[in-house]
A protein has these predicted regions:
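Helix-coil boundary and interhelical linker segments in multi-pass alpha-helical membrane proteins
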Residues: 1-11, 68-86, 117-124, 158-173
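N-terminal signal-anchor transmembrane alpha helix
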Residues: 2-28
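C-terminal ends of transmembrane helices
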Residues: 22, 27, 92-104, 130-139, ...
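Cytosolic, membrane-interface loops and tails of multi-pass inner-membrane proteins
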Residues: 23-55, 104-106, 187, 191-204
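Short, non-helical or kinked segments that cap or interrupt transmembrane helices
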Residues: 32-43, 100-113, 140-149
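Interfacial segments of multi-pass membrane proteins
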Residues: 47-52, 73-76, 94, 108-138, ...
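Multi-pass membrane catalytic core of lipid/isoprenoid biosynthesis enzymes
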Residues: 48-74, 87
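Loop-to-transmembrane alpha-helix initiation sites
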Residues: 125-127, 141-150, 166-178
């Protein structure tokens, strides 16, 4: 593995992740999403501020960022699986702490899930289904994000141990880093969940 390729992939992935899709969509509608609700740029806050259509576009854009970063590292820069995993994690970090928004951003749920699918669909697709079910039943976007990130790390570990032929240990790096990023970004939400004051998503 050529480390200069990995470093370049990580740097580009961070910039890709930093593209503030929700913020740009909000601006297109005359709204500064940073001044609404949670102040985050993710789909949940866009949904609350602007409705379903803009939120759906935000979710799609955020998902594509992580997938594009991994595809760039894996198929164009040929970094190998570790480089792809690090690039995916860098995209999530860029999404959560965008250099273009003075290091503000989202919580990384959709980007993390999309990156998980891009790295290992055997893990990613079931985890997205589970996270979606958790969201549907609880209406807590934060819990769904934690399910996709921390649950994804747990699932990657189980798959690696049980079915090593369809897993790569390098993907655990992605799972670990993205879990840290999501948990850190969701600290206020976790506190509200523990206090029973977290807002549910009710607008569609």
């Amino acid at each position: 593995m050529e480390w200069h390729r990995v470093v370049f992939a990580v740097a580009i992935a961070y910039l890709i992740g930093s593209i503030p899709v929700g913020y740009l969509i909000g601006r297109a509608h005359g709204v500064n999403i940073l001044q609404h609700g949670s102040g985050r740029t993710g789909g949940t806050n866009v949904l609350r501020a602007l409705g379903f259509g803009p939120a759906a576009l935000t979710v799609l854009g955020d998902a594509l960022k992580a997938a594009a970063a991994i595809a760039l590292a894996r198929h164009i820069l040929l970094t190998g699986e570790l480089g792809a995993a690090l690039a995916g994690a860098a995209a999530i970090i860029g999404h959560n702490w965008s250099v273009f928004l003075k290091f503000r951003g989202g919580a990384g749920g959709m980007s993390t899930a999309a990156g998980l699918i891009a790295l290992n669909a055997y893990v990613g697709v079931p985890m997205v289904v589970i996270a979606a079910l958790v969201f549907y039943l609880s209406r807590y976007a934060s819990v769904a994000t934690l399910t996709a990130s921390v649950g994804g790390l747990a699932a990657l570990t189980v798959i690696l141990l049980a079915f090593p032929a369809v897993a790569h240990w390098e993907h655990l790096v992605y799972g670990f880093l993205t879990s840290l990023a999501c948990v850190w970004a969701l600290r206020p939400n976790i506190q509200r969940l523990l206090a029973g004051t977290e807002r549910r998503v009710t607008r569609w």
